[in-house]
Structure formats: C-alpha cells, structure tokens
Regions:
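PLP-dependent amino-acid enzyme catalytic core
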Residues: 1-98
Length: 98
C-alpha cells in the first residue's frame, strides 16, 4: 500500500487540535539489545489512554470535512470505543458504542 506524504501531513493537521503530542524517548535498554537506536512513543499518555484515538479522530474528521457523517458507531469495549466516542464529541456528532 502506497501512502503519499501529503496524506500523512493532512492526517497530522486533522489530529493536531484533538490529540496530545506525546513524548518520544530513546530506550537505552532496547537500543543496546538491538544495536540500533530504539525510541518509545508514550501513547498511554494520550487523552484516551491509547493510540486508538488517532485512527478514529482522523477518520471522523475526514468524514466531517466532506459532510459524509451524521453519527459514529463503534463495536468495541476498549480503546477503540474510547477513541471513537472522544472524536465524536470533539466533532459534535452522536456516537453509538456497542
């Protein structure tokens, strides 16, 4: 799958008002184990506690931009549900989580 840089930049722009810029820290332990430079991204510090908010927020924002969404529905009892519910709230649309 090819993903143009323009799409990544657009997603970053959509996400900026919704998510935290979480910390990126070098892991000395994993870097030593692998012989490379390994960094950890602390997505557990995200507004909903996981990275799942990124996908849900980007999709809902994109659909809102195009006027193609009236409500969000997610079938999840975990992080995806929280991300979807939060993104729906930010974009002032109803969400059904089941």
């Amino acid at each position: 799958m090819d993903l143009p840089l323009q799409e990544i930049e657009l997603a970053a722009k959509r996400l900026a008002p919704t998510i935290h810029r979480t910390k990126l820290e070098k892991s000395t332990t994993f870097s030593n184990m692998t012989g490379g430079e390994i960094y950890l991204k602390y997505e557990n510090q995200q507004k909903t506690g996981s990275f799942k908010i990124r996908g849900a927020s980007n999709k809902i924002a994109a659909l809102c931009e195009r006027g193609e969404i009236k409500a969000a529905v997610a079938s999840s009892a975990g992080n995806h549900a929280q991300g979807t519910a939060y993104a729906a709230k930010v974009h002032n649309i109803p969400a059904i989580i089941c």
